[in-house]
């Protein structure tokens, strides 16, 4: 029996008999990766154990040599986390997955698994601000160069690739610019050059709206904090190996898969990348997703289809409504026919156009900030994908440290407001917006008065914890 076919009834890595494997996405959200619990638990149990007992010395040796899969140490193997990994791999159409502590950790683990000192990779310029900073600063500290491509043209990606390029990175729908690149065209460029295509599919909602692997993408990453968790309770990330890239064809470019000590490609074939992420990079960096966090994300997944259906319905209605509002200068929503990437949305998105809208108010920066401050129900925060409606003014928060030129190139205008539409009754979302619009028109600045006491108390606590006096002994 090869390693790829080894099964287990104790850690969620077992193969489900084909005749019982649920075919529909909505059913897979609840059942893929489950394993029989010895005590009969219907929910996936939380295995809060730092380490796991070996049956024998020989058993421990097999696990550590990866000639048998099983639980060793929760830094990189845990039964609860394994269920999450298997479920997300199935939902995305991959062969294996590696769950990590956050979306940012998923980015770093992926980069470290493929690139090293002297290497480079190519990324779309239109990526999440945190990812951009990782690529521009952290990768550079590791001796890895990121080459940003600002255009949508696949030929420009091809021109940036050389013999030291390890992969191309892009996002399904860029955050916050709502840019959709042609996955299949960029994939063709990558595979012609002998490198994998990686896609951050956070906005694709674990395959509900988009399954990039079906369109030539080789590796998918997620911030599981967003729609996967869905309730703003848990931070997590995941890397899904599509099993589509042939590492065996490129031993000189990817020697890490042909190391004579580990022989990842020879032993694990299509799962080689996922095995490297979990049993080498995650093991060594400790960017671990805890078992309780994994269970929270699994609970979130169970309602993902129901939530995303409502997210998409509300977003479409809000986008149309905003477009007609006299105070709104513009709306960016990939579901609108006049959006520059609407054809890409029709090609790559199913079940709807996502739940993120960007728009600007007449009155620019000040009006946008005033509007956010005036909201009473909608929450101003950096998060996305919550069941609750969330809003952000990027120019004064996530993109404040970027130059005005950079913000303009990324499509982040001073008046931009990013809206993550929740699943509330749409009448209440509109009502909150209407009262905030009224306050903007009146030019009110003394807003959220009921929160002043809470804000002052929080400021006092923060000063005690993080201020200069906190360092005194």
Curated annotation (Swiss-Prot):
Deletion consequences: Significantly decreases loline-alkaloid production.
SUPFAM superfamilies for the chain: PLP-dependent transferases (SSF53383)
Domain of life: Eukaryota
Listed cofactors: pyridoxal 5'-phosphate
Positions carrying N6-(pyridoxal phosphate)lysine: 226
Biotech and industrial use: Loline alkaloids show broad-spectrum anti-insect activity, and different lolines may have different biological activities. In vitro tests of NFL, NAL, NML, and semisynthetic loline derivatives with long carbon-chain acylations on the 1-amine have shown that many are effective against both fall armyworm larvae and European corn borer larvae, but the effects seem to differ depending on the modifications. N-Formylloline reduces the weight gain of fall armyworms by deterring feeding, and does not significantly affect corn borers.
EC number: 2.5.1.-
Cellular component GO terms held in the UniProt record: cytoplasm
Metabolic or biological pathway, per its Swiss-Prot or TrEMBL entry: Alkaloid biosynthesis
GO biological process: one example: L-homocysteine biosynthetic process
Gene Ontology MF annotations: cysteine synthase activity; O-acetylhomoserine aminocarboxypropyltransferase activity; pyridoxal phosphate binding
PANTHER family: HOMOCYSTEINE/CYSTEINE SYNTHASE, HOMOCYSTEINE_CYSTEINE SYNTHASE
Protein name (database record): Sulfhydrylase-like protein lolC1
Organism field: Epichloe uncinata (Endophyte fungus)
Gene that specifies this protein: lolC1
């Amino acid at each position: 029996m090869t390693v790829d076919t080894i099964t287990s009834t104790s850690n969620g890595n077992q193969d489900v008999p084909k005749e019982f494997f649920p075919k529909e996405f909505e059913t897979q959200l609840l059942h893929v990766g489950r394993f029989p619990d010895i005590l009969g638990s219907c929910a996936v149990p939380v295995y809060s154990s730092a380490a796991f007992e070996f049956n024998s010395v020989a058993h421990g040796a097999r696990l550590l040599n990866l000639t048998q899969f099983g639980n060793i140490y929760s830094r990189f193997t845990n039964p609860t986390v394994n269920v999450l990994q298997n479920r997300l791999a199935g939902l995305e159409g991959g062969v294996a997955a590696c769950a990590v502590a956050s979306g940012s950790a998923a980015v770093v683990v992926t980069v470290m698994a493929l690139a090293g000192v002297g290497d480079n990779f190519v990324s779309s310029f239109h990526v999440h601000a945190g990812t951009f900073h990782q690529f521009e600063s952290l990768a550079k500290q590791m001796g890895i160069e990121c080459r940003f491509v600002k255009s949508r043209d696949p030929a420009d990606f091809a021109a940036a690739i050389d013999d030291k390029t390890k992969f191309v990175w892009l996002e399904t729908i860029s955050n916050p610019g709502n840019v959709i690149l042609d996955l299949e065209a960029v994939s063709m460029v990558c595979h012609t050059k002998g490198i994998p295509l990686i896609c951050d599919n956070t906005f694709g909602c674990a395959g509900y709206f988009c399954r990039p692997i079906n369109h030539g993408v080789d590796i998918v990453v997620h911030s599981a904090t967003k729609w996967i968790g869905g309730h703003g309770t848990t931070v997590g990330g995941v890397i899904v190996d599509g099993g589509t890239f042939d590492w065996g064809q490129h031993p000189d470019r990817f020697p890490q898969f042909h190391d004579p000590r580990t022989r990842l490609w020879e032993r694990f074939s299509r799962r080689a990348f996922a095995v490297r992420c979990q049993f080498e990079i995650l093991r060594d960096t400790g960017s671990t997703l805890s078992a309780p966090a994994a269970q929270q994300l699994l609970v979130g997944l169970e309602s993902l289809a129901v939530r995303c259906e409502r997210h998409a319905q509300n977003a479409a209605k809000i986008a149309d409504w905003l477009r007609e509002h006299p105070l709104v200068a513009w709306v960016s929503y990939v579901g609108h026919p006049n959006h520059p990437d609407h054809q890409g949305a029709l090609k790559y998105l199913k079940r709807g156009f996502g739940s993120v809208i960007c728009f600007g108010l007449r009155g620019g920066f000040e009006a946008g900030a005033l509007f956010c401050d005036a909201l009473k129900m909608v929450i101003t925060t950096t998060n996305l994908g919550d069941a609750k409606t969330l809003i952000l003014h990027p120019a004064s928060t996530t993109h404040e440290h970027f130059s005005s030129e950079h913000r303009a190139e990324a499509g982040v205008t001073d008046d931009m407001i990013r809206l993550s539409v929740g699943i509330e009754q749409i009448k209440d979302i509109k009502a909150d917006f209407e009262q905030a619009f009224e306050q903007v028109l009146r030019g009110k600045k003394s807003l959220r008065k009921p929160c002043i006491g809470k804000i002052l108390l929080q400021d006092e606590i923060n000063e005690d914890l993080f201020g200069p006096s906190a360092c005194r002994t």
